[in-house]
């Protein structure tokens, strides 16, 4: 793109000491088609070395190959559309009006104040002794003709960028996190709108600092749902965990320490059947000694017999529940030929806990009793 009329290519030395302020914003041409994507650009205001008391506004490219533009400040029309939304109209013959969307509300306010002061200073004449405005100056002077704030009643809705090809998604995500942490609702909403418009997939998680401190000891009652002695096949273990860990991470820890695959684990904490993606803290785990229940379900067996994984699991079950291995040999032999005794109550379809027959819901996870379960039929069998 060639430099617009009344302007010139930006200076090659961005570290010049005359630069007053440089900020980043998402910039695109208004009136262009949707194929014209917003680009992350740097807005720069500096003193004009050839004209004391005057200033130049630059629109600098950040990515390799991007064209940088620059105009005398008095030759452009700069309009403030909203807290984070501005418009920049170069002199006639230029590329057209630019939509400028700031990612940071504080930078937007600082930039607008500096442009107002610099414009007012430039209108006072070419006096070389005039003070140069700084970013710390307050916008006490009234808006000049070339920096026009839009009245609140007529402010249009935020003009979001139409593309995401040149937007740095990681920077936008960082700005979103900073805005939320700083309590800046407007900035957070605007950045979130840009990310949502371009369907950017995010993984929003709390920082570990917001969780209770760890590690702590979780007291786990393990129930073996596969044992014929289900009423007495329980064991107690202590696990060292962090409250910010997810249930999925806890399942992997149990798999690593005891060999029980996550597929056979059902965790119940605080009378809730735990979901893998939620944290332990979300179920109230915060201090040493907090209780949890782990139910071990029966895993599907291969047609050819036990797999090495099942053999390992059986050995671990034997260590946790030694009483199941101390049955008399004749009882073990007869148990295979005799039908199993009827289970009192009904089995929860979610956590497999055996509930009393008169309970309408599961005592552990509050799941409703299956409608198909009939206490008379269960007793007769």
Swiss-Prot record:
Keywords for the protein's UniProt record, in alphabetical order: Cytoplasm, Metal-binding, Phosphoprotein, Synapse, Ubl conjugation pathway, Zinc, Zinc-finger
Gene3D superfamilies the record matches: Phosphatidylinositol 3-kinase Catalytic Subunit, Chain A, domain 1, Pleckstrin-homology domain (PH domain)/Phosphotyrosine-binding domain (PTB), Zn-finger domain of Sec23/24
Bias type Polar residues, positions: 121-131
Function per UniProt: Component of the LUBAC complex which conjugates linear polyubiquitin chains in a head-to-tail manner to substrates and plays a key role in NF-kappa-B activation and regulation of inflammation. LUBAC conjugates linear polyubiquitin to IKBKG and RIPK1 and is involved in activation of the canonical NF-kappa-B and the JNK signaling pathways. Linear ubiquitination mediated by the LUBAC complex interferes with TNF-induced cell death and thereby prevents inflammation.
Positions carrying Phosphoserine: 307
Organism: Rattus norvegicus
Domain comment as written in the entry: The Ubiquitin-like domain is required for the interaction with RNF31. The RanBP2-type zinc fingers mediate the specific interaction with ubiquitin. Binds preferentially linear polyubiquitin chains and 'Lys-63'-linked polyubiquitin chains over 'Lys-48'-linked polyubiquitin chains. Also binds monoubiquitin.
Protein name listed in UniProt: Sharpin
Subunit: Monomer and homodimer. Component of the LUBAC complex (linear ubiquitin chain assembly complex) which consists of SHARPIN, RBCK1 and RNF31. LUBAC has a MW of approximately 600 kDa suggesting a heteromultimeric assembly of its subunits. Associates with the TNF-R1 signaling complex (TNF-RSC) in a stimulation-dependent manner. Interacts with EYA1, EYA2, SHANK1 and SHANK3 (via ANK repeats).
One of the protein's GO biological processes: negative regulation of inflammatory response
Record-annotated Ubiquitin-like domain positions: 216-285
GO molecular function, one term: zinc ion binding
Zn finger residue spans: RanBP2-type: 342-371
